[in-house]
Regions:
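Kelch-like beta-propeller repeat domains
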Residues: 1-158
Length: 158
């Protein structure tokens, strides 16, 4: 599998956890898998396939996931019908369920183009940086900075 998103984080139960979402199989098919790996000292590693629990999740490739404000947040990606995503997805339950949040305060600026494989990082002041990515026609070199739940997104390289 290629073009998947991966994130390691501390779960709400304060245990190490990793999440692997989506991707593309060797024949080019996008998948909707969401693997969750959690470590518990008494049991070792446990793995769960959330796509069995919630199969309605769209197949996606080329997304990026961060942990922010107690939830997981997904940016970008392409579905199996080659539809590019520009919306932001939230998960309040560590990757089991995903939804589009209130788009009044949780959307990227009009100048942001849909893309796959962006790099997304959070700094110590809780600024989110969405950096670059790819489209069918090439690569992006733009950088956007903002906060979730606020209309303060800005392109940094205009």
């Amino acid at each position: 599998v290629s073009d998947f998103a991966a994130l390691s984080f501390e779960s709400s139960s304060e245990r190490p956890r990793a999440m692997v979402v989506g991707g593309r199989t060797i024949d080019g098919t996008a998948v909707n898998t969401r693997w969750n790996l959690e470590y518990e000292s008494s049991e070792g590693y446990r793995i769960a396939d959330f796509s069995i629990e919630q199969p309605s999740f769209n197949s996606l490739t080329g997304t990026a996931i961060i942990q922010y404000d107690g939830r997981l947040v997904m940016f970008g990606g392409v579905d199996n019908d080659l539809q590019w995503r520009s919306d932001i997805l939230y998960s309040d339950d560590e990757g089991m369920n995903w939804y589009v949040p209130d788009t009044v305060h949780n959307k990227l600026p009009e100048t942001y183009a849909s893309r796959q494989n962006p790099t997304v990082v959070v700094d110590e002041k809780q600024n989110i940086y969405v950096i670059g990515g790819q489209s069918f026609s090439g690569s992006y070199s733009d950088v956007y900075r903002g906060y979730l739940n606020e209309l303060k997104w800005a392109a940094l390289n205009d």
